[in-house]
Amino acid sequence: MDEYLWHKHKWPADVPRTLEYPKEPLYAMLDRSAEKSGNLPYTVWEGQSWTFSQVRDAANRIANFLASRGIRKGDRVAIFLPNTPHFPPVLFGSLKTGATVVTCNPMYKTGELNFQLKDSGAIAVFVLDHPAFTPTCYEAIKNTAVKTVVVCSAKNFLPKTKAVLGGLLGKIPKSPYYQKDVTFFFDDILTKSEPIAPKVEVDPEDVAMILYTGGTTGTPKG
């Protein structure tokens, strides 16, 4: 075991110096937690709770959808979302196909997002249904390899009453238009895709995510 400087100075005797981690893909932790604590809350947002089992179910459906769109092991799936509950199932669902997730700064403008999509070689992207996000995404995918855009709405995770009333009253933001040839919707995936993930051999050493730098001194690096 390597001896580090911080181990030599007042390291608590009852705290282990190393931890053993299981040799398994990242999504295996979600599957295990869903089996063990399936009915417990995983996320709570705007009064709506999603359990571990529900998030796993959504991740499996997303994985099946992506596989149906030709996503294979080693392909890149971009996530252009702010901090919404879509992120965990999209992340785990992408990983279940063997794909590598590329996280995109939700503050990016068209040119910045276009660079990252090109540089990473992403062929699918998840985006929030919002005037500030969806049109930017459609512009940014021009001259890239992206063939699939999944639009995620805030209403997907709202309590049913809030979602219905918010939609009727125009309180839930939505894109002014959708590019039909590449667009799919998050809620359709959850209702139409199978809840059992495709069987893909994923090595724990495979690349799970590409995280780009902030780009303060030049173009972001990933």
Model-identified regions with their sequence ranges:
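AMP-dependent adenylate-forming
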Residues: 3-8, 28-51
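Residue-level signature of the cytosolic catalytic core of signaling kinases
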Residues: 22-26, 129, 182, 203
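Conserved AMP-binding/adenylate-forming core of the ANL superfamily
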Residues: 20-22, 39-84, 88-92, 109-114
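Flexible, non-catalytic linker and terminal segments flanking ANL/adenylate-forming cores
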Residues: 1-23
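Conserved S/T- and glycine-rich ATP-binding loop of Class I adenylate-forming
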Residues: 55, 77, 94, 125, ...
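Conserved pre-ATP/AMP-binding loop-to-beta segment of ANL
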Residues: 174-212, 219
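Structural core segment of the AMP-binding/adenylate-forming
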Residues: 68-69, 96-188
